[in-house]
Amino acid sequence: MHDKTWSGRFNEPVSELVKQYTASIGFDRRLAEWDIQGSLAHAQMLKETGVLDEGDLADIRRGMAEILEEIRSGKIEWSSDLEDVHMNIERRLTDKIGDAGKRLHTGRSRNDQVATDIRLWLRDQITVIQSLIQSLQTALLDLAEQNAETVMPGFTHLQVAQPVSFGHHMLAYVEMLGRDNERMADCRCRVNRMPLGAAALAGTTYPIQREITAELLGFEQICQNSLDAVSDRDFAIEFTAAASLVMVHLSRLSEELILWMSPRFGFIDIADRFCTGSSIMPQKKNPDVPELVRGKSGRVIGHLIGLITLMKSQPLAYNKDNQEDKEPLFDTADTLIDTLRIYADMMRGVTVKPDNMRAAVMQGFATATDLADYLVKKGMPFRDAHEVVAQAVRHADQAGVDLSELPLEVLQGFSDLIADDVYGVLTPEGSLNARNHLGGTAPEQVRFQVKRWREMLA
């Protein structure tokens, strides 16, 4: 007798090598609890449509409850001979309750079953991810609020550009994460569509009522085409794309944390619990966590490319290729969840060094644009003002001082429009306060945005 439920068609058993190569139980068993959820809803629907009787349903519920306990306690024995999580659970159920377990699969295929399991699992992961994104946003908001008036150099091309508030810089990532959360919510809408009832590819001849199952499982919509329902994994690709963007944003922040922690910048310090030392260099304190986040972003992006490549040449409907969707999908969710959890804690352990930040502003002529704007407001065309300020910067650079440190008579040598009120715009703090408009870096605007975001996240 063959172990396979489909073995009646074949003249010889599957080879051991093929069993090992094709079995997915090693990784898809993490879907077990969601598989049981789907089966219980399917059984309830079969009972309400007259396919199962009350006794069958009671036996299935009892058996599944026992199996769920075995899974949670680690007592269940998974068999690669049974290929996957679905057949392992079905065999265990049949061993426990007999023929009622064999009737459970009526009107269903593993094709729509696994698609349902993945969507149920992914829906829950997205809920966790959205909560973790908001937790990280809150940690960044705390930093932003504490540092609304902390001035630092803003960069373009990694060259000092203009003064910005450190709080404003943190708010930039709050905004990015906000869009990430919107993408996750939008993705969840398409994940939350039920394929169950599509059967293998063409539907079923049994009098099923998919609306019953969808309501029991909390699906907002039902997949309307059986071929599409079992064969596409665009929802998994979409999730991985959204996850990739979160990781890209965290990778960018990680790069900045790494730079800012280095002695050449000295803008911040990261708590010791997120760093490691060197086996040979006693003085080292390495920012391993942000470095690893930067590295893991490539891992998630790689999963996105892998899933797209997996789907690109498959004809309808289901193909065994789709077994390869789970490991990258699982790892993407795991990596993102772990990263978000550690990142929020790490940002709460960041120590800001305002004096070093301000000193860096003073070394890069960060208020040059403010001087140009000052001249424009006095009536000089902007292009002329740009040239005048460039000459002043060159002079200050040669003298080894900041623009704000040039004497008034020297500044007036570049333009007679310059008066003693110029120093009000040449200080970093003056530059910040001058940009007091929606989206600007002024401390007042930073506090406004912090308040707005706290209300949105409440």
From Swiss-Prot:
Alphabetical list of CDD domains matching this protein: Argininosuccinate_lyase (cd01359)
Q: Which GO terms describe its biological process?
A: arginine biosynthetic process via ornithine; L-arginine biosynthetic process
Q: Which UniProt keywords apply?
A: Amino-acid biosynthesis, Arginine biosynthesis, Cytoplasm, Lyase
**Cellular location of this protein?**
Cytoplasm
Any one cellular component term from GO for this entry? cytosol
What InterPro entries does UniProt report for this protein, alphabetically?
Arg_succ_lyase_C (IPR029419), Argininosuccinate_lyase (IPR009049), Fumarase/histidase_N (IPR024083), Fumarate_lyase_CS (IPR020557), Fumarate_lyase_fam (IPR000362), Fumarate_lyase_N (IPR022761), L-Aspartase-like (IPR008948)
Q: Name one GO molecular function term.
A: argininosuccinate lyase activity
| Swiss-Prot/TrEMBL catalytic activity | 2-(N(omega)-L-arginino)succinate = fumarate + L-arginine
What domain of life does the UniProt record list for this protein's source?
Bacteria
Q: In which pathway does it act?
A: Amino-acid biosynthesis; L-arginine biosynthesis; L-arginine from L-ornithine and carbamoyl phosphate: step 3/3
Which Pfam families is this protein grouped with?
ASL_C2 (PF14698), Lyase_1 (PF00206)
Keyword Lyase included in the entry's annotation: yes
Catalytic class of the enzyme: lyase
The protein's Enzyme Commission number: 4.3.2.1
Name the family.
Answer: Belongs to the lyase 1 family. Argininosuccinate lyase subfamily.
For this protein, the record's HAMAP family field holds: Arg_succ_lyase
What this protein is called in its record is Argininosuccinate lyase
| Organism of this sequence | Neisseria meningitidis serogroup B (strain ATCC BAA-335 / MC58)
